[in-house]
């Protein structure tokens, strides 16, 4: 199913709209798990001249000018300390089907990217950003985890380069993915993807996990807030 999602995303990048309001995030703690190969394939498929390389933490200020006239932005690393300078607002605007993105280039006149001019977004990271992440971001995120480290004896040297000769086949798979996306009306999301996204939400908000797992709503019963707070603090310590 992860492969289906990837092919749907590649097909989505061929559309001049953002009707499916999604961005790709490839996550894996190890640096040897295949994330970079996927990014290399995306870059090679769309061509360097059509790809920008802003990291999510650069989604503010005059650096946004780099997104102009690009099909896709590929960020190879995300700051684990969080994003709090307007980057997430710009991310939401970029994946929105209707919002324009205001660009203020250095020493040039400001302008706006129309919805059809905005690139699709793909990121990868060994860490998950925690600060200021909210449900609006999670709702738009296609989270694919790479949880298996590839040992040296199993690595295929120059694997990314081999895909250069397979662009025709990749295009066919992307078009099939796009057809599936349009037919379904949404991206394929495996149960693993859904579970990992829920776990990510819990990491961002431990209180969310505590409320879900330990509290039961009962209109006929009242529990002192101090008692609940004590339970929560004890839960956090454990």
What is each model feature region?
Residues 1-238:
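Feature primarily recognizes SF3-like P-loop helicase cores of small DNA viruses
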């Amino acid at each position: 199913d992860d492969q289906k999602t990837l092919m749907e995303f590649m097909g989505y990048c061929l559309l001049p709209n953002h009707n499916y309001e999604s961005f790709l995030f490839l996550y894996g703690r190890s640096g040897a798990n295949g994330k970079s190969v996927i990014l290399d394939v995306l870059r090679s498929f769309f061509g360097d001249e059509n790809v920008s390389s802003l990291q999510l933490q650069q989604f503010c200020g005059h650096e946004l000018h780099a997104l102009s006239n690009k099909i896709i932005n590929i960020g190879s690393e995300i700051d684990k300390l969080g994003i709090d300078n307007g980057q997430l607002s710009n991310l939401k605007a970029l994946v929105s089907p209707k919002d324009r993105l205001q660009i203020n280039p250095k020493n040039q006149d400001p302008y706006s990217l129309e919805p059809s001019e905005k690139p699709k977004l793909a990121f990868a990271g060994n860490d998950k950003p925690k600060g200021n992440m909210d449900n609006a971001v999670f709702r738009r995120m296609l989270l694919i985890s790479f949880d298996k480290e590839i040992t040296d004896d199993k690595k295929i040297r120059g694997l990314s380069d081999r895909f250069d000769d397979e662009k025709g086949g990749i295009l066919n798979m992307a078009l099939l993915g796009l057809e599936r996306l349009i037919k379904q009306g949404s991206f394929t999301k495996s149960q693993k993807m859904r579970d990992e996204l829920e776990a990510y939400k819990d990491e961002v908000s431990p209180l969310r996990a505590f409320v879900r797992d330990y509290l039961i709503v009962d209109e006929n019963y009242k529990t002192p807030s101090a008692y609940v707070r004590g339970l929560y603090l004890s839960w956090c310590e454990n």
